[in-house]
Structures are given as C-alpha cells and as structure tokens.
Amino acid sequence: MGLMWGLFSVIIASAAQLSLGFAASHLPPMTHLWDFIAALLAFGLDARILLLGLLGYLLSVFCWYKTLHKLALSKAYALLSMSYVLVWIASMILPGWEGTFSLKALLGVACIMSGLMLIFLPTTKQRY
C-alpha cells in the first residue's frame, strides 16, 4: 500500500511540475509584479493552471505523508527520482514543451531506473 501512495505522489508531483512550468512560461514574469498580479486576478487559463499545479503539490504531499507511514524511508525517497524521468519524457512528448532528447539525459534516466531496480528488487537470504 505504501508503494501505491508513493507512486501516486510521484505522478501527481510530476503533473504539478509540468503545470507550474506551463504557467511560468505563459504568465508575466514576477519582475513585473503588477502585470503578474493582474494576470492572476484575471483568473485566465494560465492562472488556473498555476493553481492546479499548486493544488497538485498539496495533494502530492498528502500522498507522500501516507507513503512514509507505510514504506521505509530508504525506499520511499528513491521513488522521488522517478519524477525526473516522468517530467523529462513528458516534456518531449507533450506539444509545446520543446523537451530535447540527448544521450546524456538518456544515460541519466537509465541510471535512475537501474538504481530503483536495485532498491526495489526482492533480496534473497543467504544461508551459511
């Protein structure tokens, strides 16, 4: 059950990260504070996506809290690295994100996935 909550947390946090990235690239920069505030108060699509991203992070924290009650921290913390993989893949697949493929990034993803497999593979007890 802890693994399920952890996966929910990772998926929701990844979606929230993508939402915040979209909103940040479409809203006025915060250096133009009044324009930024006006865009938020207009509550257009960009502001709603920003709000969804923030609410997504809040929901992700709730799922993470449930994860930590059911799963060892050493395993739970490793799950967070999956978010990097999901966001990287989504940025290349989703239109308008302009995520780029590189062999270095692929190698990094392979390292992350290998590490997760090492952590989550069942261990066998050795007999002496």
Curated annotation (Swiss-Prot):
InterPro entries: Flippase_ArnF, Small_drug/metabolite_transptr
Residue numbers on the Cytoplasmic membrane side: 1-2, 57-76, 122-128
Gene Ontology biological process terms from the UniProt entry: lipid A biosynthetic process; lipopolysaccharide biosynthetic process
Periplasmic side, ranges: 24-35, 98-100
Membrane topology: Multi-pass membrane protein
Transmembrane segments: 3-23, 36-56, 77-97, 101-121
One GO CC term on file: plasma membrane
PANTHER family in UniProt: 4-AMINO-4-DEOXY-L-ARABINOSE-PHOSPHOUNDECAPRENOL FLIPPASE SUBUNIT ARNF-RELATED, SMR FAMILY PROTON-DEPENDENT DRUG EFFLUX TRANSPORTER SUGE
Subunit and partners: Heterodimer of ArnE and ArnF.
Family membership: Belongs to the ArnF family.
Protein name: Probable 4-amino-4-deoxy-L-arabinose-phosphoundecaprenol flippase subunit ArnF
Taxon lineage: Bacteria, Pseudomonadati, Pseudomonadota, Gammaproteobacteria, Enterobacterales
